[in-house]
Amino acid sequence: MEALAPGRAPRGRRRAGASGSVLSPLSLAAVLLCALLRAPPAVGHLARLPRSIHLTQDSLKIVGSTHFPVSVYVMLHQKSPHVLCVTQRLRNTELVDPSFQWHGPKGKLVSENTTAQVTSTGSLIFQSFEETMSGVYTCFLEYKPTVEESIKNLQLKYIVYAYREPRFYYQFTARYHAAPCNSIYNISFEKKLLQILSKLVLDLSCEISLIKSECHRVKMQRAGLQNELFFTFSVASIDTEKGSKPCTDHSCEASKRLSKAKNLIERFFIQQVEVLGKRAEPLPEIYYIEGTLQMVWVNRCFPGYGINVLKHPKCPECCVVCSPGSFNPRDGTHCLQCNNSLVYGAKTCM
């Protein structure tokens, strides 16, 4: 015999009694709303943040290599690390009369530049990195190892990429015991459920989107056929300035708001089981099937950006600007091949 958790309704359980107990749409919503209103505040734990790197600390310094171009990742609109015009070996070596000269995608860089500054010691620093500033940067170093020795020349290449954090969202799937698949009650229930979920996360500046809702007849083990609703929806954070209640403090970070929304949704479905388990009346025609709530984490990038672990192993979960020869027209996570693309961050393949 199957062991059931307290208050759990068997998946194949039918309505008790001979009289019909199909609830009206408003009554169906009342059952869900009861669970919502009784739910305690969600436990505040953070969602797993993408393991991307944050290269905006002033103390972080990047050195070059004479063997291969060094990749540098700068978060969009942020300050870059110090890109040094030396190798790791020369960094700890005394240099006599050093001379530094930097060239970027648009030509020679000068110390007076407001967006890309060259310090007196040859370090390159970006103050507010823009997507169009991505590209190859070359430093020409001229120095003497000692006063007596002749001048040596060194050329170091860096590929500087703009990157952004993924705009992830959660996708949920839940199953409900349903009325006959052609019943209007299923449609009414779906609309009311979406309204309740949307209201649940409204104050967190998150939005609920229906992905699909399908009704199927399912053959149960050692039982007959029953109708089930397969309900798939997503929850994503929206820009706080676009929300009904603009928010600017630290708690308004998208990942924190989305984590709280996820907790509220999970608690909402748990409460549905608890409420039904305490009912003295027969089960309604439509009710949540315990244990069927599934959740997956879905990443998405802005157009012109993509995730590529093989190409960017130092920034494996960053949405890195698409390199020339590739593009991303939508919010997918991959830059697609396009031989005609000649710029960084291409959104179309011309």
Curated annotation (Swiss-Prot):
Expressed in testis (at protein level). Expressed in male germ cells. One of its GO terms (biological process) is acrosome assembly. Pfam families: EGF_Sp38_C (PF20626), Sp38 (PF07354). Keywords: Cytoplasmic vesicle, Glycoprotein, Membrane, Secreted, Signal. Its main location: cytoplasm. The keyword Secreted applies. The keyword Membrane applies. It is a peripheral membrane protein. Disruption phenotype: Male mice are infertile with abnormal round-headed sperm morphology and no forward sperm motility. Glycans are attached at residues 113, 186, 339. It comes from the Eukaryota. One of its GO terms (cellular component) is zona pellucida receptor complex. Gene3D superfamilies: Immunoglobulins. Residues 1-44 form the signal peptide. N-glycosylated. Coiled coil: none annotated. It is found in: Cytoplasmic vesicle, Secretory vesicle, Acrosome; Cytoplasmic vesicle, Secretory vesicle, Acrosome membrane; Secreted. Plays a role in acrosome compaction and sperm morphogenesis. Is implicated in sperm-oocyte interaction during fertilization. Belongs to the zona pellucida-binding protein Sp38 family. PANTHER family: ZONA PELLUCIDA BINDING PROTEIN SP38, ZONA PELLUCIDA-BINDING PROTEIN 1. This is Zona pellucida-binding protein 1. It comes from Mus musculus (Mouse).
